[in-house]
Protein backbone atom coordinates (compact mmCIF):
# COMPACT_ATOMS: atom_id res chain seq x y z
CA UNK A 1 0.00 0.00 0.00
CA UNK A 2 2.82 2.39 0.89
CA UNK A 3 4.63 1.59 -2.37
CA UNK A 4 1.48 2.38 -4.37
CA UNK A 5 1.05 5.66 -2.49
CA UNK A 6 4.69 6.63 -3.11
CA UNK A 7 4.32 5.74 -6.79
CA UNK A 8 1.13 7.79 -7.08
CA UNK A 9 2.79 10.82 -5.47
CA UNK A 10 5.82 10.44 -7.77
CA UNK A 11 3.58 10.29 -10.85
CA UNK A 12 1.63 13.38 -9.74
CA UNK A 13 4.82 15.34 -9.01
CA UNK A 14 6.27 14.29 -12.36
CA UNK A 15 3.10 15.29 -14.23
CA UNK A 16 3.02 18.68 -12.49
CA UNK A 17 6.70 19.28 -13.32
CA UNK A 18 6.03 18.41 -16.98
CA UNK A 19 3.06 20.81 -17.16
CA UNK A 20 5.07 23.58 -15.48
CA UNK A 21 8.01 23.18 -17.88
CA UNK A 22 5.68 23.13 -20.88
CA UNK A 23 3.95 26.33 -19.76
CA UNK A 24 7.27 28.02 -18.92
CA UNK A 25 8.59 27.13 -22.38
CA UNK A 26 5.48 28.43 -24.18
CA UNK A 27 5.41 31.69 -22.20
CA UNK A 28 9.18 32.13 -22.61
CA UNK A 29 8.74 32.12 -26.39
CA UNK A 30 6.12 34.87 -26.16
CA UNK A 31 8.19 36.94 -23.73
CA UNK A 32 11.31 36.55 -25.90
CA UNK A 33 9.43 37.89 -28.91
CA UNK A 34 8.27 40.96 -26.97
CA UNK A 35 11.63 41.50 -25.24
CA UNK A 36 13.54 41.15 -28.50
CA UNK A 37 16.00 38.69 -26.97
CA UNK A 38 16.01 35.17 -25.51
CA UNK A 39 14.44 35.29 -22.04
CA UNK A 40 12.70 32.91 -19.66
CA UNK A 41 9.42 32.88 -17.81
CA UNK A 42 9.35 31.09 -14.48
CA UNK A 43 6.03 29.91 -13.09
CA UNK A 44 6.10 28.47 -9.59
CA UNK A 45 5.46 24.78 -9.38
CA UNK A 46 3.09 23.16 -6.95
CA UNK A 47 5.28 23.49 -3.85
CA UNK A 48 6.41 27.08 -4.49
CA UNK A 49 2.83 27.89 -5.41
CA UNK A 50 1.71 26.94 -1.93
CA UNK A 51 3.76 29.78 -0.43
CA UNK A 52 3.20 32.34 -3.21
CA UNK A 53 1.60 35.31 -1.45
CA UNK A 54 0.85 37.24 -4.63
CA UNK A 55 0.94 40.98 -5.01
CA UNK A 56 2.44 42.38 -8.18
CA UNK A 57 1.75 39.71 -10.78
CA UNK A 58 5.39 39.25 -11.68
CA UNK A 59 8.89 40.57 -11.28
CA UNK A 60 12.14 41.12 -13.13
CA UNK A 61 15.34 41.94 -11.26
CA UNK A 62 17.76 44.60 -12.51
CA UNK A 63 21.45 44.74 -11.60
CA UNK A 64 23.25 47.84 -10.30
CA UNK A 65 23.94 48.94 -13.89
CA UNK A 66 20.26 48.75 -14.87
CA UNK A 67 20.62 45.52 -16.86
CA UNK A 68 17.60 43.22 -16.55
CA UNK A 69 17.90 39.58 -15.63
CA UNK A 70 17.02 37.00 -18.26
CA UNK A 71 14.04 35.68 -16.29
CA UNK A 72 10.72 36.97 -15.08
CA UNK A 73 9.07 35.25 -12.13
CA UNK A 74 5.28 35.21 -12.44
CA UNK A 75 2.87 34.60 -9.59
CA UNK A 76 0.93 31.36 -9.34
CA UNK A 77 -2.43 32.98 -10.11
CA UNK A 78 -1.06 34.71 -13.22
CA UNK A 79 0.48 31.46 -14.46
CA UNK A 80 -2.78 29.62 -13.83
CA UNK A 81 -4.77 32.22 -15.76
CA UNK A 82 -2.26 32.18 -18.65
CA UNK A 83 -2.39 28.38 -18.70
CA UNK A 84 -6.18 28.55 -18.77
CA UNK A 85 -6.34 31.41 -21.32
CA UNK A 86 -7.19 29.17 -24.28
CA UNK A 87 -10.17 27.64 -22.47
CA UNK A 88 -11.31 30.99 -21.04
CA UNK A 89 -11.29 32.78 -24.38
CA UNK A 90 -13.47 30.04 -25.90
CA UNK A 91 -16.26 30.67 -23.39
CA UNK A 92 -19.22 32.77 -24.54
CA UNK A 93 -18.64 35.20 -21.68
CA UNK A 94 -15.27 36.20 -23.21
CA UNK A 95 -17.09 38.26 -25.84
CA UNK A 96 -17.43 40.96 -23.18
CA UNK A 97 -13.88 42.12 -24.06
CA UNK A 98 -15.40 43.76 -27.12
CA UNK A 99 -17.21 46.17 -24.77
CA UNK A 100 -16.19 48.77 -22.22
CA UNK A 101 -17.82 47.37 -19.09
CA UNK A 102 -16.24 44.94 -16.63
CA UNK A 103 -16.38 41.26 -17.50
CA UNK A 104 -16.73 38.25 -15.23
CA UNK A 105 -13.96 37.67 -12.70
CA UNK A 106 -12.57 34.78 -14.77
CA UNK A 107 -12.33 36.91 -17.92
CA UNK A 108 -10.87 39.91 -16.09
CA UNK A 109 -8.21 37.65 -14.55
CA UNK A 110 -7.35 36.29 -18.01
CA UNK A 111 -7.05 39.79 -19.47
CA UNK A 112 -4.91 40.88 -16.52
CA UNK A 113 -2.64 37.83 -16.87
CA UNK A 114 -2.01 38.63 -20.54
CA UNK A 115 -1.16 42.21 -19.54
CA UNK A 116 1.23 40.99 -16.81
CA UNK A 117 3.15 38.83 -19.30
CA UNK A 118 3.34 41.78 -21.69
CA UNK A 119 4.41 44.15 -18.88
CA UNK A 120 7.12 41.86 -17.49
CA UNK A 121 8.39 41.33 -21.05
CA UNK A 122 8.95 45.09 -21.25
CA UNK A 123 11.09 44.90 -18.12
CA UNK A 124 13.02 42.03 -19.73
CA UNK A 125 13.50 44.38 -22.70
CA UNK A 126 15.27 46.76 -20.31
CA UNK A 127 12.50 49.19 -19.36
CA UNK A 128 12.85 49.92 -15.63
CA UNK A 129 10.05 52.45 -15.09
CA UNK A 130 6.76 50.79 -14.13
CA UNK A 131 4.78 53.51 -15.91
CA UNK A 132 6.78 53.23 -19.14
CA UNK A 133 6.65 49.41 -19.01
CA UNK A 134 2.88 49.65 -18.57
CA UNK A 135 2.57 51.95 -21.57
CA UNK A 136 4.61 49.63 -23.78
CA UNK A 137 2.75 46.60 -22.39
CA UNK A 138 -0.60 48.04 -23.39
CA UNK A 139 0.74 48.43 -26.92
CA UNK A 140 1.98 44.82 -27.10
CA UNK A 141 -0.76 43.05 -25.15
CA UNK A 142 -2.62 42.28 -28.39
CA UNK A 143 0.46 40.47 -29.73
CA UNK A 144 0.69 38.48 -26.51
CA UNK A 145 -3.02 37.58 -26.69
CA UNK A 146 -2.55 36.45 -30.31
CA UNK A 147 0.41 34.26 -29.37
CA UNK A 148 -1.78 32.70 -26.68
CA UNK A 149 -4.51 31.85 -29.19
CA UNK A 150 -6.72 34.89 -29.76
CA UNK A 151 -7.55 35.83 -33.34
CA UNK A 152 -6.37 39.36 -34.27
CA UNK A 153 -9.70 41.16 -33.70
CA UNK A 154 -10.16 39.52 -30.32
CA UNK A 155 -6.54 40.27 -29.36
CA UNK A 156 -7.05 43.96 -30.19
CA UNK A 157 -10.26 43.89 -28.14
CA UNK A 158 -8.35 42.46 -25.16
CA UNK A 159 -5.91 45.40 -25.36
CA UNK A 160 -8.67 47.98 -25.76
CA UNK A 161 -10.67 46.41 -22.93
CA UNK A 162 -7.72 46.53 -20.55
CA UNK A 163 -7.01 50.15 -21.44
CA UNK A 164 -10.65 51.23 -20.99
CA UNK A 165 -11.74 49.12 -18.03
CA UNK A 166 -8.74 47.86 -16.05
CA UNK A 167 -5.96 50.42 -16.51
CA UNK A 168 -7.81 53.16 -14.56
CA UNK A 169 -7.84 50.80 -11.55
CA UNK A 170 -4.08 50.18 -11.54
CA UNK A 171 -1.83 51.52 -8.73
CA UNK A 172 -0.29 54.97 -9.20
CA UNK A 173 3.16 53.59 -10.10
CA UNK A 174 1.55 52.07 -13.21
CA UNK A 175 -0.29 55.23 -14.28
CA UNK A 176 0.31 55.93 -17.93
CA UNK A 177 2.73 58.82 -18.53
CA UNK A 178 1.88 61.82 -20.71
CA UNK A 179 3.74 60.43 -23.74
CA UNK A 180 1.61 57.28 -23.71
CA UNK A 181 -0.80 58.34 -26.45
CA UNK A 182 -1.15 57.82 -30.18
CA UNK A 183 1.85 59.59 -31.73
CA UNK A 184 3.34 60.36 -28.29
CA UNK A 185 6.94 59.89 -27.20
CA UNK A 186 6.20 56.34 -25.94
CA UNK A 187 4.22 55.22 -29.01
CA UNK A 188 5.96 52.08 -30.29
CA UNK A 189 4.50 52.64 -33.77
CA UNK A 190 4.05 56.39 -34.28
CA UNK A 191 3.31 55.94 -38.02
CA UNK A 192 0.15 53.99 -37.18
CA UNK A 193 -3.02 55.66 -35.98
CA UNK A 194 -4.29 52.41 -34.49
CA UNK A 195 -3.93 52.87 -30.73
CA UNK A 196 -2.96 51.06 -28.59
CA UNK A 197 -2.16 48.10 -30.82
CA UNK A 198 -0.17 49.75 -33.62
Regions found by a protein language model. Name each.
Residues 2-3, 10-20, 24-61, 66-69, ...:
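Metalloprotease/metallohydrolase-associated module, dominated by Zn2+-dependent proteases
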Amino acid sequence: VLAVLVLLVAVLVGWEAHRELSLDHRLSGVASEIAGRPVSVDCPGFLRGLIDLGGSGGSVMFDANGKPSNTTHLETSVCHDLSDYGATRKRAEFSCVFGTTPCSDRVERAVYAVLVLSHESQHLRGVQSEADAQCYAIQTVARVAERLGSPPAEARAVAAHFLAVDEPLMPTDYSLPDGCVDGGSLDLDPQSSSWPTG
